[in-house]
Amino acid sequence: GWQGGMEGGLAMAELLTGKGNPSGKLVDTFAASADDYPSTANFHESFDYVNYTEDIYVGYRYFETFARDKVKYPFGFGLSYTRFQTESMGLAVQGTEATVIEKVTNVGGMSGRETIQVYVEAPQGKLGKPLRQLAAYAKTEELKPGASEELILKAELTELASYDDSGVTGHKSCYVLEAGDYIFYVGTDVRSAREVGRVTLAELQVVQTVTEALAPVQAFKRLRPFFFGENKHAIANWEDVPLRTIDLAERILRERPTQSEYMGDQGWKLADVYDKKITLEQFLTQLSDEDLICMTRGEGMCSPKVTPGTAAAFGGVTDGLQQFGIPVACCSDGPSGIRMDCGTMAYALPNGTLLACTFDPELVEELYEMEGMELRKNKIDSLLGPGINIHRNPLNGRNFEYFSEDPYLTGTMAAAQLKGMGKYGVTGTIKHFACNNQEFKRHDANAIVSERALREIYLKGFEIAVKQGGAYSIMSTYGPVNGLWTAGSYDLLTTILRKEWGYQGIVMTDWWAKINEEGEPGSGKQTIPMVRAQNDIYMVTADAASNSNKDNTAEGLADGRLTRAQLMRNAANICCFLLRSVAMERLLGREEEECTELHSPVSTEGAGDSGQVLARLELPEPKTGEEIELPLEKLSTKKGTGAVYQLRFTKIGRYELVFRMSSTLGPLAQLPISVFLNNTLQQTVTINGTEGKIVEQTVILAIRQDGEKYMKLYFGESGIDMSRMFLRYVGKNDIESFRNE
């Protein structure tokens, strides 16, 4: 769907009344039936796997090549209250860059904007190609009736290269431009685009030689076009998909870093690296093995160490790490605005699909510059977005969060968001890397994909975001690709991402993700392959220091499956992120003055209902361990409601507020409760859906002064069934050091 954010209703009113003129374009092909999409046949073929048999023929690449008659509304189609006339001013080629100039004239009676799109038909060669591939797009300014604008669109020929995963061209594991005519089409959608010129290559050109990576290990067949005579409509043909030929275990072992040392505390802080007094490598030699292991664990959700109600804290999450001056960074859901489960207000932005329909990266960059300002105001270092998976099938339940069926449009839109947020020193975490193309069984369903389809379709948007948008935070997926859960996929996260693309940043798991050794089932405790693959941070744990998730990283270090050097490498990735983050500037007190002014007090009072006083309780002198029941008769746990208990404390000390609760929702549901004392947030706790099982959560309250206090509970989502709630007196021990005094 096209969710318009908090201003979407006003925009719709302007369009319906004629005050504004629509200029959006479809980012997906609309066919007559869901059954017309080639991926539908295997979309729910199995609970255990998904065969990507359509290969690179996704969306308009399929329909324009094989099934033009099935299309109701083509990719790039849009409506306007005015009419435009377009005129080609020619095609020019210089080096590897093709330039198209298109004149657009408003010949209607109302001001409006138009989008021009450039598509290329590559020669079929030995690999087979779609008949259309988006290569460039541009949008006019608002043109008054009779006004014209010349748009200059540039397309890099090397970006049109195809990946040879079989060696059929004689150049296996290479991106190649096969010999023949590259025909350029220009128009206002893929179907109406007309030929404006050709570029002819006399012989095959190797654009880039890479390494075989992430090839499938299970045999299946993939679609390729067969053309008969002069017929421009392809017939579906099928070929065997090339399988992995390299020894992955040998590659991982051969490339394993081994050099590291432990020098103990030398008195250096991360600020010394920031000030270029020492190198990062020198700094990391001070960290013990336990420190390095703790850095691989993010904490959440709703960690009290960062902005209340956010998704996770990472970096300096333990006392030991903070002693070395390592800051704690904060990340928050996204992508359509900041999510703070304590009820703090934030702007709701249009979703990814709607933003992509603008075909206007400059506008998107401007919007996300403002989002960057809001992130900085709330002391959030990364928004968990944009989501940039491909619209492989219209039945994917999360398509609204992603941009398009086209990887080029996807990548350029993601790059625009990252550039916008970057102007305020914050960033987005692009997700889900890669092939999160369905929600059903996404924790376990194995995506079986050819290496060519991965590189040309499903990884391409991420590659553009890294190379053009400067991405430096990425989230892997829940599920496996070609047998390996992505959170521990070495070829995905090291061979392709870091070695080929030159990525310098962090990778985090999705929340409570699984990882596996090849051939074994996935588990959230199996973090050894995660560390090896340079998935730097496991999201999330309740407490990094105590290994609350019971991961096996320390076990792997002890028995040689991991090295200290691998842990140091991942810690370096995390520290590099922190060194360029606002969290580091805040820790050092070095934020620019105009940025510190952003940190005006942000309300942490729960949104929605201010809360009905459910009970007034006098708490007599409690004994240590004594439990004081809180009545539940009038308690509502509906989303957005607040419940207030008026409590008179007669004894100072530490109290435990204990919730015993359940939810009939499934384990993907996230259900937060925020606890306030006299309108000051104490803590937000989050449970997942328990499928009816009762669980317990505890919030510590430090009562430093006797007398009356108002305790408010704010429920961020519906679905909690509270079975019991009580206060337990703990005593006065350590109250001076308790952080929530």
PLM features: residue spans?
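Glycoside hydrolase catalytic-domain context in secreted enzymes
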Residues: 1-192, 210-642, 646-656, 672-696, ...
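Short beta-strand elements
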Residues: 192-211
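Catalytic-site microenvironment of enzymes
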Residues: 659
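Extended, low-complexity, turn-rich repeat/linker tracts enriched in Gly/Pro/Ser/Thr and Asp/Glu
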Residues: 109, 662-671, 719-720
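Extracellular and select intracellular beta-sandwich modules with Ser/Thr-enriched
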Residues: 193-197, 697, 721-723
